[in-house]
């Protein structure tokens, strides 16, 4: 099967609607939503050759493939395992640019409402990095509590203290105490002390930017550090890697916007346990030939007979047919007939 055929099949792919409401909704105390995105490279935006190059000679050819997944908590993979797995996860993914972002969160809410008794849910935690498209989910789903994910919190703590070497651990503990139990003024005081110890302007700028990030996500960071019992660690970075990046961006690839959206939906469908053969069966078939011409299929013998007749009529120097069906076409015809015959 050629690359062009794969692209055509992917772009025409349609997905089944979400299943109807379950007879009995689950009753759980806490629900968790993790969200992040994958940065996928485009070959073009609207048409080939329309990519712009910035001042740093980098092409502006990135599109966000968004990933949101809902789960009930975590549990060990086996009784004595140190590794954990998500309990009943469900994935949502796609491009969802601009106003379509609301559609993504509406899909998440529809799933929650159809599978859980939301009146009995005490809290819904949203673990994320504070991105704008993620925070907009709070406008579509009431009662969400934002939590800054551990990865980004530790990332900016390390940025603020990496220049302190042996004293870095003590400095990080002081910062965490200020966020957990103090006020913004206490935190800014600690940031000021760190800037005094900075040896270069670059280090001072890094401390200032990291402090500004934590301040912009102040409540979410405070909940992360204070509510350790019910707040679970965020696995969004790992899930983006496994669900999206492994297929779309870990290796050099160029996509179209439609291709990114369809492949992201397909990856979510696969990780939700979707049946690939059933998905193939549900696709629209190509339109049949016009009525009355179904049986007008020329056999090889009739084609050769027609060519001989044409050859005699037009002269011996007329070009004759000398071709056979390729192995690739034979394989495609056999595979297509086999799939639809299941």
What are these regions (language model features)?
Residues 1-342:
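Catalytic center-proximal scaffold of phosphoryl-transfer enzymes
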């Amino acid at each position: 099967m050629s690359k062009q055929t794969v692209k055509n099949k992917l772009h025409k792919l349609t997905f089944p609607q979400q299943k109807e409401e379950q007879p009995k909704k689950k009753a759980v105390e806490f629900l968790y939503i993790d969200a992040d995105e994958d940065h996928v490279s485009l070959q073009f935006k609207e048409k080939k050759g329309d990519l712009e190059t910035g001042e740093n000679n980098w092409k502006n050819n990135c599109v966000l493939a968004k990933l949101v997944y809902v789960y009930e908590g975590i549990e060990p993979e086996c009784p004595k395992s140190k590794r954990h797995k998500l309990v009943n996860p469900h994935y949502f993914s796609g491009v969802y640019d601009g106003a379509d972002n609301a559609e993504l969160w509406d899909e998440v809410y529809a799933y929650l409402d159809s599978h859980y008794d939301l009146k009995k849910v005490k809290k819904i935690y949203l673990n994320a990095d504070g991105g704008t498209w993620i925070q907009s989910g709070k406008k579509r789903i009431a009662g969400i509590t934002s939590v800054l994910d551990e990865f980004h919190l530790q990332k900016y703590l390390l940025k603020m203290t990496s220049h302190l070497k042996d004293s870095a651990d003590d400095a990080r503990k002081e910062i965490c105490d200020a966020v957990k139990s103090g006020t913004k003024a206490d935190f800014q005081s600690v940031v000021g002390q760190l800037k005094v110890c900075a040896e270069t302007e670059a280090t001072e700028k890094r401390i200032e930017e990291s402090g500004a990030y934590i301040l912009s996500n102040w409540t979410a960071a405070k909940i992360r550090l204070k509510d350790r019992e019910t707040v679970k660690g965020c696995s969004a970075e790992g899930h983006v890697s496994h669900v999206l990046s492994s297929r779309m961006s870990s290796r050099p690839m160029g996509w179209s916007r439609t291709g990114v959206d369809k492949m992201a939906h397909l990856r979510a469908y696969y990780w939700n346990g979707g049946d690939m053969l059933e998905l193939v069966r549900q696709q629209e078939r190509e339109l049949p030939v016009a009525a009355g011409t179904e049986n007008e299929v020329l056999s090889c013998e009739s084609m050769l007979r027609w060519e001989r007749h044409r050859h005699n009529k037009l002269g011996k120097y007329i070009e004759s047919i000398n071709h056979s069906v390729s192995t690739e076409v034979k394989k495609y015809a056999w595979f297509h007939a086999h799939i639809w015959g299941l």
